[in-house]
Amino acid sequence: MRVDSSADPTMSQEQGPGSSTPPSSPTLLDALLQNLYDFGGTEGETEQKKIIKKRENKKRDVMASAALAAEPSPLPGSLIRGQRKSASSFFKELREERHCAPSGTPTGPEILAAAVPPSSLKNNREQVEVVEFHSNKKRKLTPDHNKNTKQANPSVLERDVDTQEFNLEKARLEVHRFGITGYGKGKERILEQERAIMLGAKPPKKSYVNYKVLQEQIKEKKAAKEEEKRLAQETDIFKKKKRKGQEDRKSKKKSAPSILSNGRIGQVGKFKNGTLILSPVDIKKINSSRVAK
């Protein structure tokens, strides 16, 4: 695409050597915008080319802003000349890039990687957290003072328990000894013997008896038990007979109804108009009381 020098006032001003009055800045900006519209208004462009152009324009804007920020502020007299040179160089770059198309557009991550300075990466590396792992084996190698104290404490506790048990045993034996004194002399000796065996003394040997003598002793014991049972039965029979006689007498007394069953003292039946009226129940009571006497 060709750019007319007549349409661009900046180009005409640069070509004309005898131009005495430089144009104002608003007219220069208007001319730049017209050239941009003419340059980007070609027909038959595909959507892909439009996207590529947009990306290129964005990159150029970013680069231009960065260059302007980096450059020192120029003097007020040299502003117009700098604007003219930047406009002419801008159009030249556009033409060159138009003729030789770019091989590939850089992607987003590449642009970000280029924009990020290396100092920030170093800071990120320094901010990485460091985690230390301590194994349990190393801890076991170091002597534990707490364990030694724990091992010493159980021995003290065992001693305390032993003393407590000893005191309880002693108290139990004292109570047992005091209880033995309450019995007679004959039984007291037997209980003392049992107490000595309980404390650890050897029991006395059993007396050996002949087999025939032992059988006779067993028979005598059986006979004594049978006699006791027979006497107990006889006494029970005698007591039962007495109880039966007493119960019979009580039952007879209960069966004989009393004349004073109505609760009135010396009165039988009911008085009505000066006459005593006896019911058949009252007559039966009177007859039964006479028979009982």
Swiss-Prot record:
The modification N6-acetyllysine is found at K185. One of its GO terms (biological process) is ribosomal small subunit biogenesis. Keywords: Acetylation, Chromosome, Nucleus, Phosphoprotein. Transmembrane segments: none annotated. Signal peptide: none annotated. It comes from the Eukaryota. It is found in: Chromosome; Nucleus, Nucleolus. Pfam families: FSAF1. The modification Phosphothreonine is found at T163. The modification Phosphoserine is found at S73, S78, S86, S279. One of its GO terms (cellular component) is small-subunit processome. GO terms for molecular function: RNA binding. Residues 1-28, 40-82, 94-119, 134-160, 222-266 are annotated as: Disordered. Coiled coil: none annotated. Residues 64-79 have a biased composition (Low complexity). Part of the small subunit (SSU) processome, first precursor of the small eukaryotic ribosomal subunit. During the assembly of the SSU processome in the nucleolus, many ribosome biogenesis factors, an RNA chaperone and ribosomal proteins associate with the nascent pre-rRNA and work in concert to generate RNA folding, modifications, rearrangements and cleavage as well as targeted degradation of pre-ribosomal RNA by the RNA exosome. Prevents helicase DHX37 to be recruited before post-A1 state. Part of the small subunit (SSU) processome, composed of more than 70 proteins and the RNA chaperone small nucleolar RNA (snoRNA) U3. PANTHER family: CHROMOSOME 1 OPEN READING FRAME 131. This is 40S small subunit processome assembly factor 1. The lineage of its organism: Eukaryota, Metazoa, Chordata, Craniata, Vertebrata.
